[in-house]
Amino acid sequence: MRVLLTSLPGIGHLFPMVPLGWALQAAGHTVLVATDREFLPVVTGAGLSATAVLDPVDPVELFKPVEPFGDPLSPAERTGHRCAEAGVRALPAMRALVDVWHPDLVIAEPMELAGPAAATNAGVPWVRHSYGLIPPGPLLSVAAEVLDAELAVLGLSALAKPARTIDVCPDSLRPSDGVATVPMRYVPYNGPAGVPDWLLAGPPARPRVCLTLGTSLPRRDPHVAPLWRLLLDELVALGQEVVIAIDESHRPLLGHLPDGVRAARIPLCDLLPTCTAIVHHGGSGSTMAAASFGVPQLVVPHFADHFTNAERLTAVGAGLSLPHDTDDLARISAACELITGDGPHRAISRRLADENARRPTPAVVAEGLAAEQRSMTPA
């Protein structure tokens, strides 16, 4: 089976799909990722073959808020518009790739629409692959409406519904939305990186907390440092061993670090099993990785799906949330003390990890896709 993976050129969009790509390859299937030239090394660094056929697009721009005055669309609907427009721009190159490569199946993350549109118009079934919580209905419906209107102008068929939707979110974390899905275990992948000796040296002497701003937030907002510095100082004051997972290029944002605080590019999949808590921005990669390891989460959401992730973690009791513009030291201190303590959020976080571990592995899902591919038809 020839499988084409399509994703926006963003780590948070592609990396959750990588384990399924590996599983398909290991089962003997041919996997190709469609991307742009700048993102090509990221894909190939994950051990997947890729072709640079797309024009560059910055996923951060798709989620950038607009001034509310005069804009009748909600943030989710506005993002849906932008995703559809990006899909239309990428469609000619994606159709050309599908025509020459002849995939048997296209697998796309929710924000990438050129792959599904090209698959639809080539009579190829496509599958949606979530990267966390499934995006809100208004986002997906507006994206489909805008895309279908553009496809009609081009004389092309409207977007077919996905033949399957692969869901990597634990059931109790995901809101009830009635969407039928194929459950799959979330397997954290954070890119190639060396593991430092100190991380392999056994349990830490003090409780260890991971602090991370993710990959997109420092690029989008270089002025995030003050609140994160307050969080860092409070965690240190509580006697925690703080490890900051951050790209080296963003390291200067944090200024001089207190003694004993480490900051480096460390994969969360290696760091989190040693941690008692994580403080992060609410991105799906950090949220899902922490959930998969049963680590309580303190979330400071800034944009896009950060808010939804924070709301769901708070609702199920697996985490806490702070507004990104707070400077209330008492509130910050209380949140840090709670998330590093032994409250009920610790048992609930462990339950999320247990739920994730019971889900079918990517290898099992890959086997199912191969068995069912011939019966999938674009709807």
Curated annotation (Swiss-Prot):
Q: Name one GO molecular function term.
A: hexosyltransferase activity
SUPFAM superfamilies hit by this protein: UDP-Glycosyltransferase/glycogen phosphorylase
Report the activity regulation comment. Answer: Inhibited by TDP-L-rhamnose, the sugar donor that most closely structurally resembles the natural substrate dTDP-beta-L-noviose.
Stretch forming the signal peptide: none
CDD domains annotated for this entry?
GT1_Gtf-like
Q: What does this protein do?
A: Catalyzes the transfer of L-noviose from dTDP-4-O-demethyl-beta-L-noviose to the phenolic oxygen of novobiocic acid, creating the full ABC ring system in the novobiocin biosynthesis pathway. Novobiocin is an aminocoumarin family antibiotic that targets bacterial DNA gyrases. Also shows activity with variant coumarin aglycones, suggesting it may be a promiscuous catalyst for noviosylation of a range of planar scaffolds. Does not show activity with TDP-L-rhamnose.
The organism's superkingdom is given as Bacteria
Chain's gene name: novM
User: Which Gene Ontology BP annotations are present?
Assistant: novobiocin biosynthetic process
Reaction(s) the record says it catalyses:
dTDP-4-O-demethyl-beta-L-noviose + novobiocic acid = desmethyldescarbamoylnovobiocin + dTDP + H(+)
UniProt-listed Enzyme Commission number(s) = 2.4.1.302
Keywords, in A-Z order: Antibiotic biosynthesis, Glycosyltransferase, Transferase
Full protein name: L-demethylnoviosyl transferase
Family to which the UniProt record says this protein belongs: Belongs to the glycosyltransferase 28 family.
